[in-house]
């Protein structure tokens, strides 16, 4: 069983895995539209974390992890708990960056618009302000944003995720007092 990470699963890998591959999925875009009251925010003052939205022609880069043989259910149970804040699972096709590896199916956690923590679209300035001010049991929301942006930049320098990098720029400007 393979699991696709496109948010904190890229940079906060606190579960065992047998193998990992960088690659992408299609027909989605990554957006900071999911609220977090259990990791990067608190009830009444949620942080914002990424989910995926359907986007014909879109693509999202990330990392696929092969769960250890014999421990798939144990690790999946842990990931179900970690991703509990409104995420459901579906299966999609993963395209490895290394084109010598054929595409294959991966499990995907996605926060849909009908879950109670879904915040939806907002002006980038408003999302940046919310990320700048939010913190929760797992730390500041800014850490989540910066770790994700740094990871994508290192893993896939050619990925110009405009939503992600625009938010990073806006939040850094706030930190610098601009």
UniProtKB/Swiss-Prot annotation:
<dbReference type="Pfam" id="PF04752">
    <property type="entry name" value="ChaC"/>
</dbReference>
<dbReference type="InterPro" id="IPR013024">
    <property type="entry name" value="GGCT-like"/>
</dbReference>
<comment type="similarity">
    <text>Belongs to the gamma-glutamylcyclotransferase family. ChaC subfamily.</text>
</comment>
<dbReference type="InterPro" id="IPR036568">
    <property type="entry name" value="GGCT-like_sf"/>
</dbReference>
<protein>
    <recommendedName>
        <fullName>Putative glutathione-specific gamma-glutamylcyclotransferase 2</fullName>
        <ecNumber>4.3.2.7</ecNumber>
    </recommendedName>
</protein>
<dbReference type="GO" id="GO:0005829">
    <property type="term" value="C:cytosol"/>
</dbReference>
<dbReference type="GO" id="GO:0061928">
    <property type="term" value="F:glutathione specific gamma-glutamylcyclotransferase activity"/>
</dbReference>
<dbReference type="GO" id="GO:0005737">
    <property type="term" value="C:cytoplasm"/>
</dbReference>
<comment type="subunit">
    <text>Monomer.</text>
</comment>
<keyword id="KW-0456">Lyase</keyword>
<dbReference type="GO" id="GO:0006751">
    <property type="term" value="P:glutathione catabolic process"/>
</dbReference>
<feature type="binding site">
    <location>
        <begin position="3"/>
        <end position="8"/>
    </location>
    <ligand>
        <name>substrate</name>
    </ligand>
</feature>
<feature type="active site" description="Proton acceptor">
    <location>
        <position position="83"/>
    </location>
</feature>
<dbReference type="InterPro" id="IPR006840">
    <property type="entry name" value="ChaC"/>
</dbReference>
<keyword id="KW-0963">Cytoplasm</keyword>
<comment type="function">
    <text>Catalyzes the cleavage of glutathione into 5-oxo-L-proline and a Cys-Gly dipeptide. Acts specifically on glutathione, but not on other gamma-glutamyl peptides.</text>
</comment>
